[in-house]
């Protein structure tokens, strides 16, 4: 009886042993799959409800990363089960090489996706900005698909500003700086940039301008990278745009002949848009540009999103700096025309 059982066991097929290289490859797939799922979870967990208030493209990328991660984990699991069922038929060498190249490219792209998700994590708005998002008797705040609009309630504003936030900065973080402009009678539209990067939609300002046809005098502007893109838009559309408001920013090229009124507001302690960069930008801006220094101000004082890596050390308070930024910004719009009555 025992002899018969032993003979039967000996006749059973033995699953092939996986090579160390194949085992390592499968483990790397598992790590990649986990990373693709974990990165979006980390972004959401560390930013609260920030993602749902940005342009939909950010949520789409996070969702794509989760789906890709689950698919990678499924491939790793199915591959292990197939190995247990026995060896696969050998493929022609050329076909195997092509498959290997395709797999390698796919894995590289997925690694880039996981890294991009981490890098695209927005700087969340802090309490002062969130408090400025409440509508009241003087300003209506409209949170729409492509932007947040600050609309004066007292009469129809005829002068407006389309504003592009800095790279990866929560659009809501601009509220405490932009709302006072609406309280002064100007329409202000803060753009929700795809992925939080203004360069991804350089003509987005045109859509906002078209949505508010009651406004006949427009300025565009922005903070940091947002200001760079706004500068390019103003230079290319100076027949439609009357003013340009730069917050810790400068143009990417020569726009000195553009027919726009420019105001450049900058902080003397800014570690990113440094005073030297502001000085160098003078040659690229119209001769009539008004430069307004915020003594002791830093890059992150132009919105409310906490500290920013690489920034300088402030020599003034955020409240004092923002009061000066608001005053200079209202002055820039005052130069263009009159606010609503």
Where are these regions (language model features)?
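Internal/C-terminal transmembrane anchor helices
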Residues: 89-121
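Short glycine-enriched nucleophile-adjacent loop
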Residues: 227-238, 244
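Conserved alpha/beta-hydrolase
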Residues: 178-198
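Short beta-strand element of the alpha/beta-hydrolase
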Residues: 151-152, 157-167
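Short beta-strand/loop motif that positions the catalytic acidic residue
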Residues: 258, 262-270
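Short alpha-helix in the alpha/beta-hydrolase fold that links the catalytic acid
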Residues: 273-284
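Membrane-embedded alpha-helical segments of integral membrane proteins
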Residues: 23-83
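Gly/Ala-rich beta-loop-alpha elbow adjacent to hydrolase catalytic centers
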Residues: 164, 221-230
């Amino acid at each position: 009886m025992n002899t018969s059982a032993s003979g039967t066991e000996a006749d059973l097929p033995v699953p092939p042993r996986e090579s160390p290289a194949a085992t390592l490859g499968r483990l790397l797939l598992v790590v990649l799959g986990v990373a693709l799922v974990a990165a979006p979870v980390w972004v959401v967990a560390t930013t609260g409800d920030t993602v749902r208030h940005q342009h939909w493209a950010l949520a789409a990328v996070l969702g794509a990363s989760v789906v890709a991660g689950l698919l990678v984990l499924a491939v790793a699991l199915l591959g292990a089960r197939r190995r247990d069922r026995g060896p696969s038929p050998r493929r022609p060498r050329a076909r195997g090489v092509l498959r290997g190249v395709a797999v390698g490219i796919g894995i590289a792209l997925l690694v880039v996706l996981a890294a991009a998700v981490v890098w695209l994590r927005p700087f969340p708005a802090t309490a002062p900005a969130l408090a400025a998002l409440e509508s009241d008797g003087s300003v209506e705040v409209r949170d729409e698909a492509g932007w947040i609009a600050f609309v004066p309630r007292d009469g129809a504003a005829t002068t407006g500003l389309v504003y592009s936030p800095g790279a990866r900065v929560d659009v809501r973080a601009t509220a405490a700086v932009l709302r006072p402009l609406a309280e002064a009678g100007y329409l202000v539209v803060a753009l929700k940039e795809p992925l939080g990067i203004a360069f991804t939609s350089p003509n987005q300002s045109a859509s906002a301008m078209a949505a508010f046809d009651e406004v006949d005098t427009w300025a565009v502007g922005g903070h940091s990278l947002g200001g760079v893109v706004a500068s390019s838009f103003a230079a290319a559309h100076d027949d439609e745009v009357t003013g340009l408001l730069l917050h810790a920013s400068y143009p990417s090229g020569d726009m000195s002949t553009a027919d726009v009124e420019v105001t450049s507001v900058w902080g003397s302690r800014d570690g990113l848009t440094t005073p030297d960069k502001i000085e160098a930008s003078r040659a690229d801006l119209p001769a009539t540009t008004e430069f307004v220094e915020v003594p002791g101000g830093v890059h992150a004082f132009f919105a409310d999103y906490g500290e920013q890596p690489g920034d300088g050390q402030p020599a003034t308070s955020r409240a004092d700096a923002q009061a000066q930024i608001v005053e200079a910004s209202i002055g820039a719009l005052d130069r263009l025309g009159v606010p609503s009555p």
